[in-house]
């Protein structure tokens, strides 16, 4: 299900649908998202994949009361560690690597609010380091100890 579809089926009146570009750097996108959401709230955040990393970082800047992340690589991506050399012009690979600044700073964020990570477990690709959903390893999705995990037999998408 897409977020747009869910939006048509709910009666929420204060949701903020934020889009960002993977061609922009992480912190440029984070600044844009924070600006769109400031002076509103409290916020319950939902993010898929890299969007979950943005959602986690938003807890530092907004009054976030809870969150759901879906297939988020909280430990980063070993694939991105080498892919950034193959496609150096694509900022996403530099931002989601295991030693990238957004991932390292995410390790410093300690959650004290309800948070659920939905872990997708189907769709393995052989060149990732370990079991994965076709994009993110299960180890990266389950790296944090301060959230609840729900496993679903589904691919990353």
Regions found by a protein language model. Give the residues of each.
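Glycine-rich His-Gly loop
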Residues: 1, 49, 120
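C-terminal catalytic-base region of ester-bond hydrolases, centering on the histidine
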Residues: 109-157
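Hydrophobic pocket-lining residues within nucleotide cofactor-binding pockets
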Residues: 20
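Short, surface-exposed "cap/lid" segments of acyl-processing enzymes
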Residues: 1-17
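Short, structured coil segments at secondary-structure junctions
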Residues: 11, 62-63, 143-145
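Serine-dependent carboxylesterase/thioesterase catalytic core
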Residues: 15, 23-112, 125, 133
């Amino acid at each position: 299900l897409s977020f747009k579809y869910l939006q048509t089926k709910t009666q929420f009146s204060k949701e903020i649908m934020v889009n960002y570009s993977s061609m922009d750097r992480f912190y440029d996108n984070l600044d844009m998202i924070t600006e769109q959401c400031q002076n509103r709230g409290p916020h319950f955040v939902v993010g898929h994949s890299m969007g979950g990393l943005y959602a986690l970082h938003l807890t530092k800047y907004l009054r976030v009361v809870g969150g759901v992340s879906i297939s988020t690589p909280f430990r980063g991506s070993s694939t991105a560690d080498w892919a950034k050399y193959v496609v150096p012009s694509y900022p996403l690979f530099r931002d989601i690597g295991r030693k990238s600044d957004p991932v390292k700073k995410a390790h410093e964020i300690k959650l004290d609010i309800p948070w659920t990570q939905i872990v997708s477990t189907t769709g393995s690709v052989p060149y990732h380091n370990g079991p994965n959903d076709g994009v993110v390893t299960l180890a990266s999705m389950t790296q944090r100890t301060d959230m609840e995990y729900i496993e679903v037999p589904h691919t990353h998408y």
